[in-house]
Amino acid sequence: MSEEHVHLDESEVYHIRKQKLAELRTGGFNFPNTFRREHLADALLKQYSETEKQTLEQKHVKVSVAGRIVLRRIMGKASFFHIQDVSGRIQVYLRSNDLPDIYEQFKHWDLGDIVGVQGELFKTNTGELTINAEHVELLTKSLRPLPDKFHGLADQELKYRKRYVDLIANEDSRKTFLIRSHLIKAFREFMDDNHFLEVETPMMHPIPGGALARPFVTHHNTLDMTMYLRIAPELYLKRLVVGGFERVYEINRNFRNEGISTRHNPEFTMLEFYQAYADYNDLMNFTEQLFHYLCDKVLATRQIEYQGQVIDFNKPFERLSVKEAILKYHPDIKAQQLETVEGCRTLLNDLGLPYKETDGLGKLQIILFEETVEHQLFQPTFITEYPTEISPLARRSDTNPEVTDRFEFFIAGREIANGFSELNDAEDQAERFRKQVEEKDAGDLEAMHFDSDYIEALEYGLPPTAGEGIGIDRLVMLFTNSQSIRDVILFPHLRQ
């Protein structure tokens, strides 16, 4: 709570401010909307902070700013206060001799009130750029007190529930979401520069597909049919490649009815893209170029500090198969142990890791990888050769049909991207869908449905294609050194 009401609780402050608003209304205050801002605080600071005090006085620079009062010092017949706009803060100097009526009103305004200020720039004796107010106008009366300026919102969950207050009080939060916006803009620039077409595909699907995940279910009243919030746009984007759009991308939300953690949110943002006449090796090269561009454009560095360690995007990204990664981080494991179901079961039993009796060799290998290796992949790393049995939409390897031409991209121990050469054999895809249906019937809630319309689209002919999905929320976490995915989502879902 602000220093003006340190001895009052929030309800008492709210009551006092409501009374002030009632008095303002009696005097004709009606939340005016005629003041026009012409300058932002940060732009003025950048332009004039280095200007000498005497030179600035000779220039007679007139400005018009607006923002929220976040600090004020009333000193008899003169006061200083800071206003905060989207770009930053600037100081204002107000004298009773210049504006006696306004000054008397100002003494009754509160931190959090939004004002418009017109005046002339000058520098104080300490060198701080300041506006000598010639006109000050109350634009919005704030009824609720701001958090303490030194501590902000101390309750982390309250930050998520009342993000609007967090953004007022916490400069780091504002920076996080500005970086998020700049990152998404940079994604679009890179995709557009590489001749990809941005498209929009349905958010409600008659058949969930495109990923192994549990969907949210809803009902379309007019059509009287069950619909599913999309878990991935993949099958619709590939339909567009069938239709002749050879490079497409979409930045949008996906929804998965699964657990919440520091790395998972049921509603999340993805960049997903597809390129005809390319394979997964092309996409790994493309991804390296993309991440170099994002680092240069958004952060102006290719070395990022995350949770006390440095991620180096300058070096070539390491590429390891699933088996190679297991052997690298488990030097005691022999390669032949990974080649049989019994060998993998023994390894998992020794480590105390659960598995199902129905899990095949590939699934057992992935359990071992995900539970013991994934978290150790701190530097940018591509993991390749994912088993066919867990990759129902990916093309089989020409050299080993038990694995696919697929990669997952890891940074700081978490999956950031998933890409592969697309399966464009309609008969093979239909058979894999049938196996997914068998798994669903056996109780796997994340297994895929059989999508006959997608099979029909493949039967028209999908050119050789590669596709990739990149998790934007997790990438923002890295770029902003954030510990939780909820720190980078403006309004994350919370338990009521």
UniProtKB/Swiss-Prot annotation:
InterPro entries reported in the protein's UniProt record: Aa-tRNA-synt_II, aa-tRNA-synth_II, aa-tRNA-synth_II/BPL/LPL, Lys-tRNA-ligase_II, Lys-tRNA-ligase_II_N, Lys-tRNA-synth_II_C, NA-bd_OB-fold, NA-bd_OB_tRNA
A GO molecular function held by the record: lysine-tRNA ligase activity
Binding, Mg(2+) 2: E415
Cofactor binding remark: Binds 3 Mg(2+) ions per subunit.
Keyword Cytoplasm: yes
Compartments, as annotated in UniProt: Cytoplasm
GO biological process, one term: lysyl-tRNA aminoacylation
Residues annotated as binding Mg(2+) 1: E408, E415
Cofactor: Mg(2+)
One of the record's GO cellular component terms: cytosol
One Pfam family this sequence matches: tRNA-synt_2
Main location: cytoplasm
Alphabetical keyword list: Aminoacyl-tRNA synthetase, ATP-binding, Cytoplasm, Ligase, Magnesium, Metal-binding, Nucleotide-binding, Protein biosynthesis
Catalysed reaction equations from the record: tRNA(Lys) + L-lysine + ATP = L-lysyl-tRNA(Lys) + AMP + diphosphate
EC number: 6.1.1.6
Similarity section: Belongs to the class-II aminoacyl-tRNA synthetase family.
Summary of subunit composition and partner proteins: Homodimer.
Official protein name in the record: Lysine--tRNA ligase
Organism name: Legionella pneumophila subsp. pneumophila (strain Philadelphia 1 / ATCC 33152 / DSM 7513)
Gene that specifies this protein: lysS
